[in-house]
Amino acid sequence: MLTSLGVKQGHHALDFGCGEGRYTVPLSQVVGKEGCVYSVERNEEAILAAKERLSLFSDPDVVRLLKSDDIEAAGLIPKKSIDAIFAFDVLQYIPDSDKLFLYFRSLLKPNGMVCIYPAAIPHPGDVDIKLIITKMKKIGLQYVKSTEYKMMHSADMVDDIVHSFKRIAG
């Protein structure tokens, strides 16, 4: 799935809301030693689980696990340095998606991708993908496609949709 979404060896990726690192591990394997994966999470228990999983399956020089509370203010991820951002099953927990999307755009290289998986399983605070497409377009992130994949959701595999956006000029 990750390569079909455009991730390549040597890329720099952001796994925003990485949880226990279920997508961070395969991302790190795709980008390889020449690449980098920033994994961002705010939940301490999930961070500990991600550290354990990453120690078993990922090169520690490839993955940078960051706590999300102060990431933008600290400037931990360089602007215009990211090829692909993944926000999988996390947007329902974000109170200000406008601010988050602007931050994502600031991190993306030209033609960089944002991939969103809103999760079909009901959560508090549903995600309106039509509204997201409108918001992304307003800030210069062009809708590319919606593709169905087998997605990891907690301990389950579900058929669901990933929506892709590309940074356009500016």
Where are these regions (language model features)?
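Conserved SAM-binding loop
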Residues: 50-51
